[in-house]
């Protein structure tokens, strides 16, 4: 782990979760009420604190991902294919994304709307994501160490010495100035854990279920871990933009125009031919498809031009969106 204890509220104000490290090279500790009380007192700083131990178990930081997520009729997801520390908050998100990716594909195959080869794309699309998020979460743990080093908290666990090291940063000496600079740099680097929007938002699928039609993948203009770069390039998640109901003025996200068990075609004025062609193909294949022509005097209007800025096609072009809300 990161070498630091944790106290987290479960229910205010009388139920708490405490995380405490132990040496994995030795035996697992027996977490008795006496042991747990000692840990709680040390973390909170109250030598007379009394607790009621509800439950205890041991857990080890994992650095594990599956390179293959399916085999025959067996499909795995969630913790079965990626296990990692809680850094970056990627656990539940990624598990839900796994199921979201697989569910609509299974439904189409079971309904006879797609061949079984569609299920191969689950492995092709999600296995690289498993590797990516496990790598990122474990890297974030390693990036915590410089903070403790800069604070002088890596030289033992004596509380008096630790407090002395912390107070040293308040001195007017050159050494204290260097310490303050080291602290600033170490904390700033944690943006890769707490502000890394691109880690998830920039994920792009590549599989036989994605048709690029020869389009060149857009390069990332900024750090792809930190900064989300909206794109409708096939395989990327559909960008959010507010569009407005012509009749009521209510705002609706482009994300909410899509999904709901249907493929979606988004186009603008002059894109009627795309609508006719897509609806004909959908009818022939027996699949659900919803079309939206976004523009003036249409059911949905792009008043602020937000959709026009991120769609990467002209008014007369189109974006075809999977049931899972990725461009395809």
Language model feature labels by segment:
Residues 1-175, 203:
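Core Rossmann-like FAD-binding/catalytic domain of the broad FAD-dependent monooxygenase superfamily
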Residues 38, 42, 108-327:
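Helical substrate-recognition/capping region of FAD-dependent monooxygenase/halogenase enzymes
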């Amino acid at each position: 782990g990161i070498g630091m204890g944790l106290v987290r509220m479960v229910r205010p104000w009388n139920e708490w979760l405490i995380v405490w490290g132990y040496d994995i090279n030795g035996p697992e500790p027996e977490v008795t009420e006496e042991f747990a009380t000692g840990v709680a007192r040390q973390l909170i700083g109250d030598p007379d604190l009394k607790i009621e131990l509800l439950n205890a178990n041991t857990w080890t930081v994992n650095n594990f991902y599956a390179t293959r997520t399916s085999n025959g009729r067996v499909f795995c997801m969630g913790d079965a294919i990626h296990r990692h520390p809680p850094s970056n908050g990627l656990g539940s998100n990624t598990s839900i994304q796994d199921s979201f990716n697989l569910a609509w594909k299974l439904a189409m195959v079971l309904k006879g709307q797609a061949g079984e080869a569609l299920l191969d794309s689950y492995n092709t699309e999600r296995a690289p994501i498993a590797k990516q998020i496990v790598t990122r979460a474990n890297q974030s743990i390693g990036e915590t160490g410089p903070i403790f080093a800069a604070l002088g908290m890596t030289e033992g666990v004596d509380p008096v010495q630790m407090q002395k090291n912390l107070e040293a940063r308040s001195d007017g000496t050159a050494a204290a100035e260097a310490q303050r600079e080291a602290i600033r740099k170490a904390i700033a680097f944690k943006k890769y854990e707490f502000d890394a929007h691109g880690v998830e938002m920039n994920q792009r699928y590549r599989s036989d279920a994605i048709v690029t039609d020869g389009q060149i993948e857009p390069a990332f203009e900024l750090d792809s871990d930190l900064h989300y770069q909206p794109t409708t390039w096939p395989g990327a998640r559909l960008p959010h933009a507010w569009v407005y109901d012509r009749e009521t003025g209510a705002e609706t996200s482009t994300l909410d125009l899509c999904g709901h068990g249907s493929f979606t075609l988004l186009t603008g004025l002059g894109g009627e031919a795309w609508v006719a062609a897509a609806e004909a193909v959908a009818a022939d294949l027996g699949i659900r498809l919803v079309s939206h022509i976004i523009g003036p005097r249409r059911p949905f209007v792009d008043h602020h031009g937000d959709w026009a800025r991120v769609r990467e096609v002209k008014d007369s072009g189109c974006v075809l969106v999977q049931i899972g809300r990725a461009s395809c």
